[in-house]
């Protein structure tokens, strides 16, 4: 399935024009777990249909439902169904969550926000630093690699960089939290389970769910082009993550642990 399709539109300005416009596809994805020959339907996620295996992997790990080293295989059983076979999983956590996730909300189904803090792998220990000029250059680097955005102008992105500003992984999705799950999921599928000396750059704002997912992967710096939320700042403070927002060409705001930025 293509991540974008053409739709008819009408432009109204000085003259009425009929055009064909590219729009980002939003479709449901069923995510399942297979364990001991039994299938568990975990979640239906509204997403853009690209990198589905990475999305399912990142979602399940970032939600604390599975541990990355327990994954046996990830398979796409149909166009809108991905199944992750695992040695074991967190059955209690699965029972305590209503897993319908729309493309704009990654935390909507959680019955207790405190549960999100419980499943983290601990605070980030890395004290490695990077120069502010590297942070300022990340949004443009990410934008140049946003292939779907160049066609539709309506899709989020998330990218992992090393502390020298080299891109490691990038993903796009109509949901910003999905883009993060995809980006982290790609690394997990390469058997990389934690990256403390890394920067997560996201389009849009830095909400709670973005910081929660970053903490699960051990990311030390999160950078966003728009505003943070109060709870995102709280998570960053708690897990020793440097949170930077309003990143522009010559300025940025640092909301937590500024000592990592030179």
Curated annotation (Swiss-Prot):
One of its GO terms (molecular function) is sulfurtransferase activity. One of its GO terms (biological process) is Mo-molybdopterin cofactor biosynthetic process. The active site is at residue 105. Mo-bis(molybdopterin guanine dinucleotide) binds at residues 246-251. Keywords: Cytoplasm, Molybdenum cofactor biosynthesis. It is found in: Cytoplasm. InterPro entries: Cytidine_deaminase-like, FdhD. GO terms for cellular component: cytoplasm. Its main location: cytoplasm. Pfam families: FdhD-NarQ. Belongs to the FdhD family. Required for formate dehydrogenase (FDH) activity. Acts as a sulfur carrier protein that transfers sulfur from IscS to the molybdenum cofactor prior to its insertion into FDH. PANTHER family: FORMATE DEHYDROGENASE, SULFUR CARRIER PROTEIN FDHD. This is Sulfur carrier protein FdhD. The gene is fdhD.
